[in-house]
Amino acid sequence: MFAAALLSAATASAQCTGDGVQLYPAPGGIVPTNMRLLLEGVGTAKSPVLGLVGKPLKLVSTDHEVKLKVTKGWESTLGRATVILKLAEPMQPDKRYFLNLQEVLPNVSLLNGQVGAQPSWLSGKGPDAKAPKWVKRPAVSEGFVRRSPQGIARFVKLNLALREESPAFLVVKLSPRRLGLSPQQYLLPVQGNTAYLGHEACGGAFALEDGRSYRARIEAFDAAGNLAPSTPPVDFEAPSAQGP
């Protein structure tokens, strides 16, 4: 369906992320007062993150606290897991809220935040109650393969567009077209109208086998958890690492 391309070492989607956690929406941004936080554990941080389910967490500003309920989200077979942090009440507008991760995950690195600083977000003017709308439904545009000393990274690039002001995310249920194999389901952040489905050489979100046919059922939502309308599944073949 598409040609596989060898990625350069500088290609971000093929790099090994390393052990630690990632927060979505990414720390530092402006978020709706009813945002829903996603906390991903990568590598050795996967189990500690899953261990937070049911434990009390909170967002703290100078004069307001919001309790967070931690529920299980999605788990990858390649060393990743994401939990959902739901706000017990909305944040107050125009305030900076902090999450003390070191209190519950000591000595765990934050991979998408400022080094040495508590992750924080600035609350916006109000809640986000409007669901995202599709401008361009997801489609696979190309496949990428990169060989390195650690192994093979393999991705497909999803092109899409949503009418949505806050950060958007996909939950993909990926099923091999061959019967008898279990589906995979995991989270993908949308970055600049694209999302990368696949795996790095040392782990990742989805295991793609060389040249295998897949069907991806895609669900999109925004930072507040509002769901976009359903969209047809996407069929594709995983890129092959075999040269011509």
Enumerate the predicted regions with their spans.
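N-terminal signal peptide c-region/cleavage motif recognized by signal peptidases
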Residues: 9-11
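N-terminal non-catalytic regions of secreted/periplasmic and cell-surface proteins
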Residues: 13-58, 114-166, 217, 238-244
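Extracytoplasmic/surface-exposed domains of secreted proteins
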Residues: 33-55, 80-108, 156-158, 210-222
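Extended low-complexity, serine/threonine- and proline-enriched intrinsically disordered segments
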Residues: 46-67, 159-187
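Solvent-exposed beta-strand/loop surfaces of large extracellular or lumenal domains
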Residues: 62-78
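Beta-strand-rich interaction surfaces with strong enrichment in secreted/lumenal proteins
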Residues: 72-74, 87-89, 204-206
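Aromatic sugar-binding surface patches on proteins
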Residues: 76-85, 190-203
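A structural signal for beta-strand boundary/capping segments at domain termini and interdomain linkers
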Residues: 227-229
